[in-house]
Amino acid sequence: MSRVFDKSISEKYSKYFSSIGELTASFVEYSLAQSEPVQDQEKKFQPWDTGKVGVPLAWSRKSNTIFVDHTDTHTLVVGPTGSKKSRLVVMPSIRILGSAGESMIISDPKAEIYNRTASYLEQNGYRVFVLNLRSPMHGQRWNPLTIPFEFYSHGEIDKAYEFVNDIAENLIQTEKSVREPFWDNSAGSFFFGLALLLFKYCHEHGLDSTYVHMGNIIELRNVLLSVPYQRNRLWAYAKSDQIIAAALIGTIETASDTKAGILSTFDQKVRMFSIQPNLLDMLSTNDFDMNRIGAVPTAVFLIVPDEKTGYHSLVSLFIKQSYEYMIFNAQLEAERDGIHTGVLKNRVNYILDEFSSLPTIRDFPAMVTAARSRNIRFTLIIQSKHQLIQRYRDETETIQTNCNNWIFLTSR
């Protein structure tokens, strides 16, 4: 644990924190590097340790100092509606992290966090980006298909398949029916095949990534189903690739009733793209290099409507894709330098408000476990532990175990 070095931050947020003398037993016993309680640790600190920042845990009334956890520890924040999670944890954390230039990816259901902290970060030299799913025209653009297409174009076929599969699972196979998962799985396989078919066509016809987007995936779906498959030239072209054929044949050449069920499921999952041209445009290209998040001070705000859940799958997908892509590039650079494990140059902090409201992120327990050695931290903010159990079931214990800091807030 260390002191935050910017005293103005301490003065701004001190009223929200317990003093050292008022800490509960769990906080007093909590020690990151030594076994002695916080009161004894305080005597050893040099004033304003610089560059060591993290989630705020306590405040000293005597020295007007906020104490933070600057290690690679993850944090779980539990508090019901009205417990001021954003004001007590999220906003102070952003200002503290911003004072040291650490990167952040922040889910922001109400855009309140962005409105209160973006200008501060910009003044501190941050590159600030906004993916605004509430108002797609007012923010940056992000195409989730660009990265896998780049892998495909450079011959990294397995990696391209991996990233496309992540997209299919997060957009199409979310909230699978327990009784009949066949429809979601089949729709996901259909999406996987369409994406690879689009990659194949664009790569072989010299078309760049501007042609690779959700709108053209929907267009391919329509062309493939426009005429019977026996005389469909696009289907004949698709079957020249075994992987694409295997992914699509279960829909294209199946019985009519089964085909109708799969297509109905698929169309329902992608409807938000087909009926919202502004959203489709936002997801058609990239305005920023995702890999730079782990290289230079960057803040990405993921603004999503909190009154409906239809867009939450895109937030889960961004979290998954950004994590995987940054680690891939860090590992690639490490291998070039003869190092075993790739570590991000600039620490990235995922601050995920309403985390348990997001669709399940595939492999998240493994992500949160491996993040520590990659210079990545997670702050997971939920309303109750029960919500987390509902979402991640048997994997909840792994997530909780990897969060050494637990902060409980009450609205009373």
Question: Where do the protein language model's features map onto the residues?
Answer:
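Pre-P-loop entry segment of helicase/translocase ATPase cores
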Residues: 2-69
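P-loop NTPase motor domains
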Residues: 49-376, 391, 401
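Conserved ATP-driven motor cores of ASCE-family P-loop NTPases powering translocation/secretion/packaging/pilus
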Residues: 368-370, 374-412
